[in-house]
Amino acid sequence: ITSDWSSDVCSSDLNIDPSAFDNGIDDATFAKICACLRLAVPYAGMIISTRESQAVREKVLRLGASQISGASKTSVGGYASQESGAENSAQFDISDNRTLDEIVYWLLELGFIPSFCTAYYREGRTGDRFMTLSKSGKIADCCHPNALMTLKEYLEDYASERTRHTGSALIMKELVNIPSGKVRRIAAERLEKIANEIERAHV
């Protein structure tokens, strides 16, 4: 292993239904496991899938989950096929069957910023560089405005009117919370650019 070697660690936490398996655990124990993982690896990503119920996902979000899925398909070709029999090849059952729009609205109502950003991979903010930014708290200078911009893109392109209204209000509220004046100005300019580009595309 060389001195410049680095990697990213991410855990996908899956519960086992106690009604289906003798060694399954209850929701409270699952939440404790997630909390222990967050304390043990504070900078690692933690993904909670749609295998968990809405109630479990909401609880674990507050314990430090960093990613959740929405409108997931687990069958072969599930995203490409709309046929009713497609789910017959599902790899596992889904507990949270809400649409992506419903998931985004739910997160907004809980006060979270739904982020579709993957810029840290494209920009090389991984491994030791990511850890340096995270431990110093400077990662927020990148992630906060990027989250607002990717949310804006989603709202303009795909969201229902209800979700768009709630999300737009959250963006305006969060924009003023960006501590750096320079970053705040750039974020505001890019948010306006996103809105203008969408308007022109719809003319």
Model-derived regions: residue spans:
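Single conserved hydrophobic/aromatic residue that forms the stacking wall/gate
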Residues: 1-9, 201-203
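Conserved C-terminal portion of the radical SAM core fold
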Residues: 6-17, 26-55, 62, 67, ...
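N-terminal/domain-start segments enriched in small and hydrophobic, helix-friendly residues
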Residues: 6-23, 120-126, 130-132
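A short, structure-level motif marking secondary-structure boundaries and short turns
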Residues: 18-19, 40-42, 87-89, 145
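Hydrophobic alpha-helical scaffolding
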Residues: 23-27, 46, 90-97
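Radical SAM enzyme core and accessory elements
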Residues: 58, 63, 72-201
